[in-house]
Amino acid sequence: MYELPDTVAIDVVLLPPGPIMDMAIGANRALLAGNPDGGIRLDRANCLPHISVAMLPAKSGDIPEINARVDRIARRCSPMAMTIDAVAKHRSSTGGTVSAFHILRAEILQLFHKTVMNAVKPYQAPPAGPAMFAGEASAPSVDCLLRFGKTSAYERYSPHITIGFGDLPEIIPGIDFPFRFEAAKAAVCHLGSHCTCRRVLAEFDLGPRTPAARGRAARR
């Protein structure tokens, strides 16, 4: 059974469908080809491509309540149409370039983000350093988690799928922007280094398609 630390770095996310995950993983491999020590190696098991909705440190004992709140929100929300419109890049706190698929901030996505943020905010716990994360985590990872509410939430929310460290070309063979898809699943994840999604703690379908909560125990 997967054991959580007393304080857990969590990320409430939207999971893209399989073809979009594969597209992100392929772009990540292109970055790693030029930077094998890039630090982020996306895959479908231990480092999921995702769209962050809310990040926070939370007590492990509060996670069942957080899961229940996210489940209620997810069941009131239909699957969301999304558009990747470009490759976005920014400088990390260590000076490297981070590339991502930028996603247009549709009104429904902004509302989902705001609703989830308001629902989980009461569970924010005092930070506990790198021990909150799955595996090793650097000081910039801790800082990214703790700054989310101030620098990346509400009016500053900028949805994206992080691809990795490096300068991803804005024109990628086989990918024509804008690229549209539908997100139909949400999840609560345990964060790893670089605020990657290392473990799925619970997963939910968007929309009232099942009578019971779809939260599941961690896969690993």
Give the role of each language-model region:
Residues 108:
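Soluble or luminal CAZymes and related metallo-dependent hydrolases
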Residues 1-83, 89-92, 111-190, 199-220:
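Basic, often amphipathic N-terminal segments
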Residues 98-105:
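Short histidine-centered catalytic/ligand-binding loop motif
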Residues 93-97:
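Acidic/polar active-site rim loop that often engages polyanionic ligands
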Residues 193:
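Extracellular glycan/ECM-engagement signal in secreted proteins
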